[in-house]
Amino acid sequence: MKRWNGWGDDSIDFALGDDALAFLAERIGPGLPNVDASHASACAQLPPSRLPPHRLVQLAPEVRLANALGQSLPDWLRLRHGRIASVPDGVAFPDSGAQVRDLLDYAVACGALVIVCGGATSVAGHLTVPAGERPVLSINMTRMRAMLNLDTEAQLATFQAGVFGPDLEAQLRAHGYTLGHFPQSFEYSTLGGWVVTRSSGQQSLRYGRIEQLFAGGRVETPAGRLDLPTFPASAAGTDLREMVLGSEGRLGVLTEATVRITRLPHFETFNAVFFPNWEAAAAATRAIAQGRLALSMLRLSNALETTTMLTLAGHKKLVGTLETYLRWRGCADGKCMLMIGASGEQAGAKAALRSALVLARRRGGVHVGRKMGDKWKQNRFRNVYLRNTAWQHGYAIDTVETAVDWPGVTPMMHAIERAATAALGEDGEQVHAYTHLSHLYAQGASVYSTFVYRLAGSYEGDLA
């Protein structure tokens, strides 16, 4: 069952061992666990619905609460502290475009605002219900999850927009195909959500960002239906798909999406390379990205993230053996880890990996093989569960991401981390901040920073 006030399935945990907790305590102090609000108390505070009856609209408090917030830290704090400011007045679960059309007509008739909900994994406040006199209807798309068409000749697949990542991949893999879009929220986010938030997957180097994968679709708007036909390319005017990409539900409800698919790779490998310092690691990573090699992923962790991830992983003896070897090879306290992924035909993928390793070794890179890469792939959708466990031990975790050209990557990383650590300095609190480059381009990179700090014991203190 999905957690009502945290991330993911409540049967899955990311355990933190004694060494990991000691590491956090040394960095920022012992955690201060919070007493969370109960689900019953959160539901009890919800106001009555202002919507008139409709056969598709559910008004139960637990349903309204489940569709009220996403996964940003402010959303978490509202749920954990029981400070639910506002929720939708009702939630509908359509199973067809016709039902979405019916719901939009209903919303217009009763003057309701509409918020479109998929997996509720947004960290940007997309699901926040505005205060005001108008009622709010949430349209939850997750019952619209069928594959409607598979065109193997054009390598296009059309899905209802509410399909979750694992369901989408399972339907494609049954025919030997993949979309290849794997954001960290993959297990609980939807195709429609990816499109309207301009999502990027972990293996975007091979498969492309969602704007490269989105070929067309269908949108229901209050004024009528908008069909976006598929074209391999066009030189005729504005690309109407750009109206939908990143629109975050403001234009209308994306009910169908046609995406560009790829044959399942015959071969896939993820390999870890360590560098003695950030300067060498960033230079090597830039050289690999600008070499335009046929890789599927590059992910570079700075020194503090590398240390943090190795510590939180447990397996103290194995990590100790690795670090002894790396020190012997010249990668000591400031070491940074680069994860390299290669997917496709075996010969081509192996050739791309070899070329990347040549560039890495020129800058002092130490290749440690596939074992860490296999472990990363196994846990890549599990690491986000750390937020739940950290909270239980009295710590909050938040993230921020931006993208800059290569000359600005390192200055941006340092500026973000300095700002984060200074944020609570006036209160005498420490912040554990670390960064990785999550999406790499010839022009620049996405800078993804994580902050860990102790809970303050109050909603206002934790939010500050």
Label the predicted regions.
Residues R145-S301:
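FAD-binding subdomain of flavoenzyme oxidoreductases
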